[in-house]
Amino acid sequence: MPSVYVGMVCDLLHEGHINVWTIAHAKGDVTVGLLTDEAVESYKRRPIQAWKDRKTIVSAIRYVKDVIPQPTLDYTENLRALKPDFVVHGNDWVTGPQASARQAVIDCLAEWGGVLIEPAYTDGVSTTSLIEKIKCT
């Protein structure tokens, strides 16, 4: 079975996460590189939920075979260790603070012929938008 790597924060579970996991699972066994609290804070904000709590949630998802820590925004350490056939990430990282991480993933995957799959970001669904909705209620 092919292997698939998905790096993510998954602070507040939403439809967009499920969409990514569904696409990833269709390609093979999914390992989630769950960004540590420090990794998340390095490019946006402190997560609402601690890493161990997010790991418990993500581990319960049927599409996910394994959850490992991703200690930085740079995926390459985990990718070189796992050498996945595919990396799946929403297309929201083409520009912005994750653009250099994206390019590093592309370069790393080229070392063994891995493929980056970038499904369209789920419109109107994000942890940031959920936080804003909660603040307004």
Whereabouts are the PLM-identified features?
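Nucleotidyltransferase catalytic core that binds NTPs
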Residues: 1-137
